[in-house]
């Protein structure tokens, strides 16, 4: 539950900051503060923070700080693209190296045949590269308001759909001692 809150909390803070706080600058500040609080809570409570959370928060701190200092919203808008590309490369390379990173993230929930982990790695890499392209299209061609709404009402449903589309692979290739 804490992990979910730490992922969704900064997005909610960003959305609220944009629509109720006065635009991208406020939204960025709210998101930065919320992200630091969430990652700190995760560390204090769980005594660990995932590598992906560290990467995500680091990119956010850099792009968010540049946005606040420069007043240019482009930096916060390219943050998702940068993260999606980094994550896409991580999942692609782990699949190529036959050491699927996604296995370590999900193995406590589901146990799969090794080749299924590799397939899931490639699919996840493709998803992240797709999302990088979509983010670029949206922020470059639409208003700030549309981009913010897309981050909340577009990215989350697209991610849920991607996860649901992976269920047949997971169910077909799960090992007998799997939790799902």
From Swiss-Prot:
InterPro entries: YciB
Membrane topology: Multi-pass membrane protein
Keywords from the named record: Cell inner membrane, Cell membrane, Membrane, Transmembrane, Transmembrane helix
Entry superkingdom: Bacteria
Annotated localization: Cell inner membrane
Keyword Membrane among record annotations: yes
Keyword Chaperone attached: no
Transmembrane annotation, as ranges: 4-24, 25-45, 52-72, 76-96, 118-138, 150-170
Pfam family name, one: IspA
Main localization, broad class: membrane
One GO CC term, this protein: plasma membrane
Known function: Plays a role in cell envelope biogenesis, maintenance of cell envelope integrity and membrane homeostasis.
Family, similarity comment: Belongs to the YciB family.
Listed name of the protein: Inner membrane-spanning protein YciB
Species this chain originates from: Rickettsia massiliae (strain Mtu5)
Taxonomic lineage of the native organism: Bacteria, Pseudomonadati, Pseudomonadota, Alphaproteobacteria, Rickettsiales
Gene: yciB
């Amino acid at each position: 539950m804490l992990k979910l809150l730490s992922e969704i909390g900064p997005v909610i803070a960003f959305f609220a900051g944009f629509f109720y706080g006065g635009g991208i600058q406020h939204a960025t500040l709210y998101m930065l503060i919320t992200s630091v609080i969430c990652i700190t809570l995760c560390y204090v409570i769980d005594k660990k923070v995932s590598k992906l959370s560290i990467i995500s928060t680091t990119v956010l701190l850099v792009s968010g700080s540049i946005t606040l200092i420069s007043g240019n919203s482009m930096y916060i808008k390219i943050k998702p693209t940068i993260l999606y590309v980094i994550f896409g490369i991580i999942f692609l390379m782990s699949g190529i190296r036959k050491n699927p990173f996604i296995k370590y993230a999900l193995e406590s929930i589901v146990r799969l045949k090794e080749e299924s982990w590799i397939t899931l790695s490639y699919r996840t890499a493709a998803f992240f590269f797709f999302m990088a392209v979509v983010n670029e299209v949206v922020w470059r061609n639409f208003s700030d308001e549309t981009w913010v709404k897309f981050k909340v009402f577009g990215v989350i449903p697209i991610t849920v759909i991607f996860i649901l589309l992976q269920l047949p692979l997971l169910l077909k290739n799960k090992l007998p001692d799997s939790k799902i």
